[in-house]
A protein has these predicted regions:
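Inter-motif core of Ras-like GTPase G domains
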Residues: 87-150
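Canonical P-loop GTPase G-domain recognition
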Residues: 171-174, 182-206
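A conserved segment at the C-terminal end of the G1
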Residues: 38-53
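Eukaryotic intrinsically disordered and solvent-exposed regulatory patches
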Residues: 12-16, 26, 49-50, 59-64, ...
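Switch I (G2) and immediately adjacent beta-strands of P-loop GTPase domains
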Residues: 52-100, 108-110
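Short, flexible boundary segments at extreme N-termini or domain junctions of P-loop NTPases and their
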Residues: 1-32, 63-66, 74, 86-87
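Structural beta-sheet core signal
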Residues: 29, 106, 175-177
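ATP-binding Walker
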Residues: 35
Length: 206
C-alpha cells in the first residue's frame, strides 16, 4: 500500500469519527409496584428476559447505545422500584444537572382501572414537585440553563386556545398504559372514559 493511500484512509476515518456525534439522554421510569416498569425498560433496551422477574428494589440502572442515522444515542435508564413508598428516590436521579436531557416515563397499570388515575395524579404531582426544586437549584447555579429548560416547556402553548388551562411540566413526561391486554376486555364505554381521562391528564400537564 502506498503512503498516500495510508494517509487517505486515515483522513477518511477521522472524518467519519467526527461526523458521528453522540447524544446522551437520561430516562427515568416511575410507577406503582407491579405496574410493568421492568418490562418496559427491557423493551426499550432490547433486553432478552429470562426466567421470572423479581421486584425492583430501589433504583435499577441499565445502559443502551444505538446509532440513529449518523448520531450515536446513549440512553441511561433509571427504574425506580417500590412504588410511592420509595418515590423520594426520584430526586436522586432527577437533579439540576440532568434536567436538560431528562425524560420521565410514568407506567400506569391499565389492568387496575379503578386506581389508575389516582396513581397517575400522584406521579404527575411528584414529578412536578421534584422538577420545580431542581429548577430552583439550577437558577442559582446556571440561570441561563434554567431559563432554557423553562422556555422549552412552554413555548408551544403560546397563543394556543388552551394556553391558560395547561400547566406543562418543564421536562418531557410520557404516560404509558401497561397491561393493555387485560384492560382491553373492559366494556367499550369504560375504555372510552378512561382514555378521555388519560388524554385530559396528558394535555393539562403539557
Amino acid at each position: 500500500m502506498e503512503q498516500n493511500d495510508i494517509f487517505a484512509l486515515a483522513s477518511k476515518a477521522m472524518e467519519e469519527k467526527q461526523a458521528v456525534k453522540e447524544s446522551e439522554k437520561t430516562c427515568i421510569i416511575v410507577g406503582e409496584k407491579g405496574s410493568g416498569k421492568s418490562t418496559l425498560v427491557s423493551a426499550l433496551t432490547n433486553e432478552e428476559v429470562k426466567g421470572e422477574r423479581k421486584p425492583t428494589a430501589g433504583i435499577d440502572f441499565k445502559y443502551s447505545a444505538k446509532k440513529v442515522e449518523a448520531k450515536k444515542v446513549v440512553g441511561n435508564f433509571h427504574e425506580i422500584g417500590g412504588g410511592r413508598f420509595l418515590s423520594d428516590l426520584l430526586q436522586t436521579v432527577l437533579n439540576s444537572s440532568k434536567l436538560k436531557d431528562a425524560v420521565v416515563i410514568i407506567a400506569i397499570d391499565m389492568s387496575q382501572p379503578d386506581t389508575a388515575l389516582y396513581h397517575l395524579d400522584f406521579w404527575l404531582k411528584k414529578i412536578r414537585n421534584v422538577v420545580d426544586k431542581a429548577i430552583q437549584q439550577l437558577e442559582k447555579d446556571n440561570p441561563e440553563a434554567a431559563s432554557k429548560v423553562l422556555s422549552q416547556s412552554g413555548y408551544k402553548w403560546e397563543g394556543h386556545t388552551d394556553g391558560r388551562r395547561v400547566f406543562p411540566i418543564p421536562i418531557q413526561t410520557i404516560i404509558v398504559g401497561t397491561k393493555y391486554d387485560v384492560f382491553g376486555i373492559e366494556e367499550s364505554e369504560n375504555k372510552k372514559w378512561m382514555c378521555r381521562a388519560l388524554r385530559f391528564f396528558a394535555h393539562t400537564n403539557g
